[in-house]
């Protein structure tokens, strides 16, 4: 039986340090382990490759490399890691773009506080499944 890790590992990437601090506190209080933090998209990609977190939470608008491009690179390099894109904008078009880039979910910062725990738990489950079964659409053992 596939089980969640005791504390799903999360990398936070946002150029606003206060938001990262608030999100880190919320996640750690609810059982997640924040394994790293980044203030720009390129650094977030490098950290995701090095740390191999279960989940990357990344802002859409980041210096150096935006959140959509960073998501594509993270998903290309480690398909089991789930990416949750944050944005100040509630936009179906941006959500569609985030999902096309490989994001597990898109959260607008206005409603994030109410939804982040549930969305990240779902992402942790998907990360475990992807690590054990391969990317969605592939059967276990298919190569």
Report each predicted region and the residues it spans.
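Active-site beta3 strand of CheY-like receiver
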Residues: 51-57
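Alpha4 helix (beta4-alpha4-beta5 surface) of REC/receiver domains from two-component response regulators
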Residues: 69, 90-107, 111-114, 118-122
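Receiver (REC) domain active-site loop signature in two-component systems and cognate sites
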Residues: 62
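Non-catalytic signal-transmission and effector/linker regions of two-component phosphorelay proteins
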Residues: 1-9, 117-143
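Two-component/phosphorelay signaling modules centered on CheY-like receiver
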Residues: 17-36
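Short amphipathic alpha-helix used as the core "switch/output" element in two-component signaling
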Residues: 46, 68-79
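Acidic catalytic/metal-coordinating carboxylates
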Residues: 40-43, 65-69
